Amino acid sequence: MATTLSFSRHGAGIGDAAAVVRANAVSSGLDAAVATCPGWTVLDLVLHLGAAHRWAVAVLDGRPQEQWPTEASVRAEGLAAGDVLDWFDDGMVHLLQVLADAPADLQAFFFLKDAPRPREAWARRQCHETTIHAVDAMAARLGSAPTAAQTWIHPELAADGVDELLTGFVPRRTGRLRTVAEEPPLTVLVRATDVDRAWTLRISDQPVVTTAGTGEDGPTGGIPDALWEGTAVGLYLALWNRGDELAETGPRPFLERWRRDQRIEWS
């Protein structure tokens, strides 16, 4: 799950997305419902993202696991702050400072296999964590998920986020994407239409096997059971269940099951 983006590009992505979170939180108000996160308000979103940033800082700082903050403790800290958006900004800036100060060969925990080195892996993870939740902040202001064209996201960053999801999160043993009893394995080809990136997912009763590559026929060739196509940003939003700008063709549709079963867990 090597990244094609630079460390500095991921850092810039964190800052860009955090600015989108703040601007939309100010516009919609902290009590506004988040259309893409049922049951959440913008305040919940800001507190969650602030907790994610602070948790990453604790890991990068090398604190023992028992000293990592819980979301509940950080939420209480944010609620006690004089201005929760200033508190959010402070956490984001601290994260960027810690990333910038970390040596390239930093040894630190990271929870996805075959990831880049920890410093790069955490910059990437926090970039996409912040970007996707910035889309949620936009959804709170708009009242529905934004289209790809309404976002600020660059296709290269979106393709990197798709890659992290499909090669990092989806193949985990805790993943829920499986065939059911007596159902034969199937392949899904995910192909971006505006950048030369493609991924083949082999789905069976075992953890998903993802192969990343390029080309119209995808990294493994052959005829897939399902083909998912869209722009890089459209795929990014759709695969994170923040949009529907993804076209599915093929004899064994699987997209509905993806939307039902694909959930992200950090542990």
Region annotations inferred by a language model:
Residues V190-A232:
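Acidic/His-leaning functional-site neighborhoods
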Residues G218-S267:
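C-terminal interaction segments
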Residues S27-Q67, K113-R176, L235:
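Short, contiguous alpha-helical
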Residues M1-G15, A19, A23-V26, D217-P219, ...:
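Actinobacteria-biased recognition of intrinsically disordered, low-complexity terminal regions
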Residues D86-A134:
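Hydrophobic alpha-helical segments and helix pairs
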Residues D163-L201:
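A glycine-rich beta-turn/hairpin centered on an aromatic-Pro dipeptide
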Residues Q67-E71, Q107-K113, V209-T210, G215:
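Conserved catalytic-core motifs characterized by acidic clusters
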Residues L5-A76, G82-D86, D90-G91, L95:
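Active-site-proximal cofactor/substrate-binding loop regions of enzyme domains
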